[in-house]
């Protein structure tokens, strides 16, 4: 059984990975927030403590690191560029060097925001990035460093799903808001390729088992606007309330936003020989998970 170590194990991606993969691998990880999932060895300290990370790598005989920890608040990155550089680039660089030293494969979770959004259609791995925010720039720098080592994987993605912590994810926020009869304004002019975190976990498991390496876009098949996916969630969950169209052009942000974050998953789909859900198929599975009380099982660990 392979041993996998997860940074940011209490976050939405990290906790779902731990919960979903714990029966197939030995799972350990680190976070500043507490996480209790049966069969998972989680440790409460900063991923910046490389000596402790080294000790845990050796203790758990780690084969693969999935590096989820990051500063993902785009506006906070813009306000604190030095801190964003430290968390998103320097930490990743240090972990990549440790992985190289200890012969651990690294899977780096990156973002769809590395492109400038000016392309019509979906971005492929061969398209040239053009980050327009501090967040995107720091993640791209980290990507480039990690890719120096041929055994590693860089994953560009955009996820939604259920959160382990008492903090609503994007999808949960839509459900909660509509349940409270709140009116929502969603952007009709921002497009992305969101993938359900459960499906991403399954695909990452395939990547590990087949020892893939390189850069991959792991995302939904096709793209959708923020407004369209909110409407889809409302209809699938049979919620009342109102969702209004809004334009990114009418809002001021601290950090610039990318209008088109749509990614093509053709490369990973062909290499693994799989179909990845469209955004609307993903929403249907999101509802099925809700009906099966997956969110409650996840929180119980």
Label every PLM stretch briefly.
Residues 45-87:
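NAD(P)H-binding glycine-rich loop region in Rossmannoid oxidoreductase-like domains
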Residues 164-165, 190-198, 218-236, 285:
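Substrate-binding strand-loop-helix patch
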Residues 203, 210-253, 259, 294-300:
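Mid/C-terminal beta-alpha module of Rossmann-like enzyme folds, strongest
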């Amino acid at each position: 059984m392979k041993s996998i170590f997860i940074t940011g194990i209490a976050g939405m991606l990290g906790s779902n990975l731990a919960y979903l993969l714990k029966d197939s691998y030995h799972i350990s990880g680190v976070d500043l927030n507490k996480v209790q999932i049966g069969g998972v060895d989680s440790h409460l300290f900063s991923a910046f403590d490389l000596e402790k990370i080294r000790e845990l790598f050796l203790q758990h005989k780690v084969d693969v690191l999935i590096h989820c920890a990051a500063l993902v608040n785009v506006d906070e990155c813009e306000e604190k560029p030095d801190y964003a550089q430290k968390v998103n680039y320097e930490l990743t660089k240090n972990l990549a060097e440790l992985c190289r030293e200890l012969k651990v494969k690294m899977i780096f979770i990156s973002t769809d925001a590395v492109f400038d959004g000016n392309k019509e259609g979906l971005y492929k791995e061969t398209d040239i990035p053009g980050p327009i925010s501090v967040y995107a720039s720091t993640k791209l720098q980290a990507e480039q460093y990690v890719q120096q080592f041929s055994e590693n994987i860089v994953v560009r993605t955009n996820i939604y799903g259920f959160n382990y912590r008492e903090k609503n994810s994007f999808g949960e926020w839509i459900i909660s808001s509509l349940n409270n009869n709140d009116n929502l304004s969603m952007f009709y002019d921002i497009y992305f390729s969101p993938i359900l975190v459960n499906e991403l976990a399954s695909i990452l498991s395939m990547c590990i088992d087949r020892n893939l390496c390189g850069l991959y876009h792991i995302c939904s098949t096709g793209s959708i606007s923020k407004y369209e996916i909110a409407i889809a969630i409302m209809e699938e969950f049979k919620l009342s309330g109102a969702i209004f169209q809004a334009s990114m052009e009418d809002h001021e942000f601290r950090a610039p936003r990318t209008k088109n974050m749509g990614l093509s998953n053709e490369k990973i789909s062909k290499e693994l020989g799989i179909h990845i859900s469209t955004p609307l198929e993903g929403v249907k599975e999101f509802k099925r998970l809700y009906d099966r009380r997956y969110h409650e099982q996840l929180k119980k660990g």
